[in-house]
Amino acid sequence: MPAPSNEKRILITGATGCVGQYLVEELLAETPHKLVLVVRNPGKVPSDVAESDRVEILKADVSDVEGYSDRLGRIDVALLVAAGWGGPNAFRVNVDANLALTDHLVRNGGGRVLYFATGSVIDAEGRMLLPAKELGSEYIRSKYQLVEEIEKRSGAIDIVGLYPTLILGGGNGKPMSHFANLLREVRPWAWLAQFFRADGKFHYVHARDIARVARYLVDAPLDPLPEPRRIVLGNPAVSANEFIEQFLAYLGLRPPFTITLRESLAEWIIKLFRIQLSPWDRYCMQHRDLSYRRVYSPADFGLPMHCPNLATGLAEIGIPVRR
């Protein structure tokens, strides 16, 4: 692992979110760098972070780059974590603000930008996935556009894309990830879910492991990484059935029989309960293998894994194990 080089000033957006809080914590603990946090509500910054003499907090709407760019000072590295999840805000934050901040670094001598995309916009080989642009939600389409535009700036500044898969994380004072919230919500229904099996394959990753990789890439030489630098973050792929079995084993459940939820049965359930599917939902139903040929975790960079298995992640988000 490279030792942190000269002290840097690092801009972080989205610092009060799930991944953002782990990232700030990681950088303060493992590097000498100073952090500039652009946050709308400084009250959401943990007190120990806000009181650190290495942290500068700028109260601002991240999408209003013109309104705060003159207060940024020298920025060596930007970690663009903030996300707009839907509506016009998705494009204002995910595209416009991220590109404006990248351009600001280019004009003012910045060295590196790490932006956050999503695994949904690339295929198993890391190529851009056209259906994501055509069928995706506003969030997914905006992330697709971000990748297209920000990679054009790679000749002027180091550009590294981080593409998390399903994110576990939260608890102990940190905001829950969407996936963690979903698992907590389905926990009371595990007695029913235990009887079903389904096709599919995917990755998951803990937010702290995302933070470790991002922290490493702040200082590491980038030559070993293939271009374009699209770093898919995840544990080894698991099938849907393996995930269900691990979840049930953690809860101490062992079903006496199982029913495979094939596409015809799924369609019947959708019609019975009048479930509304978006074009992207329908696409994902038809393309259930969401695994990638090359994924990265802290172990790939010589760092310890925080969450090497599902049981560790479930315990951390507060799902009690059944004794």
Task: Locate predicted features.
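N-terminal Rossmann NAD(P)H-binding glycine-rich loop of SDR-like oxidoreductase domains
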Residues: 8-33
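NAD(P)H-binding glycine-rich loop region in Rossmannoid oxidoreductase-like domains
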Residues: 51-100, 104, 124-127
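Conserved Rossmann-fold NAD(P)-dependent oxidoreductase catalytic core, especially the SDR/UDP-sugar
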Residues: 98-142
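Conserved beta-loop-beta element that borders a ligand/cofactor-binding pocket
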Residues: 149-174
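A conserved pocket-lining segment of Rossmann-fold NAD(P)-dependent short-chain dehydrogenase/reductase
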Residues: 184-205, 216
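Substrate-binding strand-loop-helix patch
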Residues: 201-208, 229-250, 263-268, 308
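Terminal hydrophobic/aromatic helix or amphipathic segment near a protein terminus
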Residues: 244-293
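Amphipathic terminal alpha-helices
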Residues: 291-323
